[in-house]
From Swiss-Prot:
InterPro entries: Ribosomal_eS1 (IPR001593), Ribosomal_eS1_euk (IPR027500). This is Small ribosomal subunit protein eS1. It comes from Encephalitozoon cuniculi (strain GB-M1). Keywords: Cytoplasm, Ribonucleoprotein, Ribosomal protein. Residues 1-24 are annotated as: Disordered. Belongs to the eukaryotic ribosomal protein eS1 family. It comes from the Eukaryota.
Length: 239
């Protein structure tokens, strides 16, 4: 058997062999798109997102359906509402602008946990509502009992019968305030906490309540289009 010269033997362990780095920049094939939320908010430009360049004619369609969330304090400039964030889904693209449609709302985890109190009763309810355009949203609300003046007991629990009455009020308020409204009006009511204030007002007639609010809104079925609730934002881009 002939002896091969040094360096001609096959590499036994290729894991430790360093790969040659190419000089190509990873961001050279990326495109930047601006994220734009609905026009009802004062600050409706919410940053940028990346997409890899493609040779396809409709390569921008890869962006459709991408979800992102924005804190309400960034949307309105008011830090007092920084405990709430809105979720948007990219539904239309005009040039380098991505128009986001409403896709849900949620409280921040620290705010949600801070509202739940020991020795109190937590009352929760959820109900599906149908918007004007046929979109279906599932609304989650909550409320916590409150000690009224002169209350001396350590615990502040509500009777089960009164809890059922308060939950019935929650269902009725969700139906009255949100059902049948267009999506923009729903977003305004969520931003102003109209539902939570109404629940606290009516429910306190049965038992004192506090921290009543819409905890979460989840999209079940969306029929939003560029002509429903978003035309103003698109016109602002094209003009």
């Amino acid at each position: 058997m002939a002896i091969q010269p040094p360096g001609s033997y096959p590499q036994g362990n290729k894991k430790g062999k360093a790969k040659k780095k190419s000089g190509q920049n990873a961001f050279a094939r990326k495109e930047w798109y601006t994220l734009r939320s609905p026009s009802i908010f004062p600050n409706n430009i919410n940053g940028k997102t990346l997409m890899t360049k493609s040779a396809g004619k409709n390569s921008y369609m890869n962006m459709i359906g991408r979800r992102y969330d924005v804190n309400q304090a960034d949307l309105t400039g008011n830090n007092d509402v920084g405990h709430r964030k809105f979720i948007f889904k990219i539904g239309d693209i005009k040039g380098s602008e991505c128009v986001g449609f409403f896709d849900g709302m949620e409280l921040t985890s620290d705010k949600h946990k801070a509202m739940i109190k020991k020795w109190h009763t937590l009352i929760e309810a959820q109900k599906d509502i149908v918007a004007k355009d046929g979109s279906v949203f599932r609304v989650f609300v909550m409320g916590v009992t409150r000690r009224h003046p002169g209350y001396v007991k350590k615990t502040c629990y509500v009777k089960h019968s009164d809890e059922k009455k308060i939950r019935k009020i929650m269902f009725d308020v969700i139906e009255e305030e949100l059902s049948g409204c267009d999506v923009q009006k729903i977003m305004k009511k969520l931003a102003n906490e109209t539902v939570g204030k109404r629940i606290e007002e009516l429910g306190s007639e049965i038992f004192p309540l506090q921290n009543c609010c819409v905890r979460k809104v989840k999209t079940i079925k969306s029929h939003q289009t560029a002509s429903v609730g978003q035309q103003e934002a698109i016109d602002a881009i094209t003009n």
